[in-house]
Regions:
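Conserved PLP-enzyme active-site core in the AAT-like
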Residues: 1-187
Length: 187
């Protein structure tokens, strides 16, 4: 796991009895940043004696930095390792002129905290499972949601997600392009 994983990652890993091996980038100059490269991941996978079940990264990081997801996904898949992404601050990445969303760049599993960068109430999120991921992922995801999720989901949050889905399908990409253009002009 990248060293900048969200603090809830550790209790979840402990509950699931997972051994976590921390990954540090060669260029470790940032305080909140942990911009791992494909080379960092490859080096780790070459020198480890026990192949991990997955590489877990936070992307984008808390400062908005993005890793080269496609290259990292290639390294993971060449080594038979799954790539799991905490995309908490990047739900909008799918709607850039060229998608930078982890699922489009090779991630096997990805969670978007829609409430952070999309018009959704707090707690609203999307869990994406790649169609090429192992078949057990869907069943395991349902079990995990039963363990970690609520038995009484907020209908307001579900409605906000549904409304957001409609907005994403209809006009969000155009509005994002327009806003990005305006911000670029201000620079």
């Amino acid at each position: 796991a990248g060293r900048n994983a969200h603090k809830t990652f550790l209790p979840a890993a402990a509950l699931l009895d997972m051994d976590v091996h921390w990954l540090y980038p060669k260029d470790n100059t940032g305080y909140l940043s942990c911009n791992l490269s494909a080379e960092d991941i490859s080096d780790y996978l070459e020198r480890t004696t026990e192949k991990p079940a997955a590489v877990y990264l936070t992307n984008p990081d808390y400062l908005g930095n993005l890793v080269d997801m496609a290259s990292i996904a290639d390294v993971c898949h060449q080594n038979g390792v799954l790539l799991v992404i905490d995309n908490a601050h990047g739900a909008y990445l799918k709607f850039l002129p060229q998608s930078r969303h982890p699922m489009d760049l090779g991630a096997d599993l990805c969670c978007d905290s829609a409430h952070k960068t999309l018009p959704v109430l707090t707690g609203g999120a999307y869990l994406h499972i790649h169609k090429a991921a192992p078949a057990s992922f869907c069943a395991n995801a349902k079990e995990a949601l039963a363990l970690f999720g609520s038995t009484s989901p907020s209908y307001l949050t579900l409605l906000a997600l549904d409304s957001c889905n409609r907005d994403l399908a209809e006009e969000y990409a155009a509005r994002l392009r327009e806003t990005s253009g305006e911000l670029t002009a201000l620079r």
